[in-house]
């Protein structure tokens, strides 16, 4: 018997959720007129020509309105509020991540000493760090509980690197003739809200403590703020109020001064909120300094902002409210899927399975009881029933593995419909039961 593929690995939306008509309407609004009032404005430019380095000003202003007034609801005059010059537009979080590493770190000569990555981690982030020169210089830091990290291990590792003899290294090899770049001694990568893969959300105390540590050790914290708006704990017909992003906390508490660059950068995208094919996102820093630096890399200076047209399509969708309606629809659909997945896991999985609450984002993380072998179960499930799971071995920090593949799985709700979710977990549970019988595991 041939089974239909049920794929819990895919971390992108079902095709039916892609807002084709809304994108068509926004594109027509941008390109329909023969001219636009900003076509010859150097800060904006024609949508089909090279953009400015930091991206169209009106789009950045629209994102600021979305963040300040609609989402986080900052009061006028609050230090947390963002401004257009604090943003650098880019072509999505993946490109944004690599650009940050290339423009703010220098592992090649030892100036940037180490990268710290929260584990389990988004598996493809390893490639960005490797491309940026961090192979052999990545340390995994465990999460603790549902809202914190292993601070003891982080501080111990930092102190160890501080105590080691350091090569005489400068940042000269990364500096250009017109802009003095801020280069950090350490870098950290994390997803503070509805993390991929664990689903965890850091407490305010955890966020503040991380920033304090970053300031002490000259560390840049790169936060993937890509899931925090996909909150399923509040009504889907109104925008949620996410936890403060770490860049907001850093901005509101940072010492004032023109030479400040801060210790955080928000790496955000509209891929999870509208459609990944648009390839559009933005960096947000505490002030204009780091945002400007990120906009002055060689590729940006050569070709301008990498998503000039698509940034304006998204800007128009934000202006018209179409983007907000897309978000509401996604939250409604994903919330239902999250409920079905949680119910199915409780119904079909072995007694003692640890299930992380799926309160937002795409993923939940489950841990089977001792003696079960996650990699073996996922292999059997794929071969026998065509159910594709991502066992924990996919979410390691390369070079500092924690054996997540022994007992853990990440499950995604973004791609599958509710019937497939329930059926897939039923088959998952059946294979676990068979595995237990074969291996004499007490159920």
From Swiss-Prot:
Any one GO biological process: biosynthetic process
PANTHER family in alphabetical order: AMINOTRANSFERASE, LD15494P
Molecular functions per Gene Ontology: 2-aminoadipate transaminase activity; pyridoxal phosphate binding
Official protein name in the record: Uncharacterized protein YER152C
The species this protein was found in: Saccharomyces cerevisiae (strain ATCC 204508 / S288c)
Gene3D superfamilies to which the protein is assigned, alphabetical: Aspartate Aminotransferase, domain 1, Type I PLP-dependent aspartate aminotransferase-like (Major domain)
Domain of life: Eukaryota
GO cellular component: cytoplasm; nucleus
Lineage, opening ranks: Eukaryota, Fungi, Dikarya, Ascomycota, Saccharomycotina
Note: Present with 1390 molecules/cell in log phase SD medium.
């Amino acid at each position: 018997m041939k089974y239909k593929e049920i794929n819990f690995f895919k971390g992108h939306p079902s095709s039916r959720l892609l807002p084709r008509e809304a994108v068509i309407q926004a594109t027509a609004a941008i390109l329909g007129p023969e001219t636009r009032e900003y076509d010859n404005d150097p800060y904006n430019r024609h949508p089909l020509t090279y953009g400015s380095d930091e991206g169209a000003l009106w789009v950045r202003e629209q994102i600021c309105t979305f963040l300040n007034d609609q989402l986080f609801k900052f009061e006028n005059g609050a230090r947390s509020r963002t401004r257009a010059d604090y943003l650098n537009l880019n072509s999505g979080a993946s490109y944004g991540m690599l650009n940050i590493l290339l423009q703010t770190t220098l592992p090649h000569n030892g100036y940037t000493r180490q990268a710290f990555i929260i584990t389990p981690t988004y598996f493809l982030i390893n490639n960005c760090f490797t491309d940026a020169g961090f192979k052999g210089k990545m340390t995994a830091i465990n999460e603790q509980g549902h809202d914190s990290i292993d601070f003891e291990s982080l501080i111990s590792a930092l102190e160890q690197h501080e105590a080691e003899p350091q090569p005489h290294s400068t940042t000269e090899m990364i500096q250009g003739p017109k802009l003095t770049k801020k280069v950090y001694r350490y870098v950290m990568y994390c997803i503070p809200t509805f993390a991929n893969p664990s689903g965890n959300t850091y407490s305010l105390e955890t966020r503040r403590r991380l920033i304090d540590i970053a300031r002490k050790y000259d560390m840049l914290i790169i936060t993937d703020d890509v899931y925090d708006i996909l909150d399923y704990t509040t009504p889907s017909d109104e925008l949620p109020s996410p936890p403060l992003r770490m860049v907001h906390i850093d901005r509101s508490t940072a010492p004032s001064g023109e030479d400040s660059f801060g210790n955080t950068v928000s790496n955000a995208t509209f891929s999870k909120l509208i459609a990944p094919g648009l390839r559009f996102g933005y960096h947000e820093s505490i002030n204009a300094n780091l945002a400007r630096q990120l906009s002055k890399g060689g590729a940006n200076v050569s070709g301008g902002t990498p998503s000039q047209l698509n940034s304006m399509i998204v800007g128009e969708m934000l202006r018209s409210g179409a983007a907000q309606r897309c978000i509401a629809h996604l939250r409604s659909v994903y919330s239902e899927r999250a409920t079905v997945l949680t119910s199915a896991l409780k119904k079909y999985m072995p007694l003692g399975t640890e299930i992380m609450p799926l309160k937002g984002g795409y993923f939940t993380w489950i841990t089977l009881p001792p003696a079960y072998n996650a990699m073996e179960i996922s292999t059997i499930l794929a071969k026998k029933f065509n159910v594709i799971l991502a066992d924990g071995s996919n979410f390691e920090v390369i070079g500092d593995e924690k054996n997540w593949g022994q007992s853990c799985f990440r499950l995604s709700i973004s791609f599958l419909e509710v019937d497939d979710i329930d059926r897939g977990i039923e088959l998952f549970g059946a294979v676990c039961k068979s595995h237990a019988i074969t291996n004499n595991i007490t159920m």
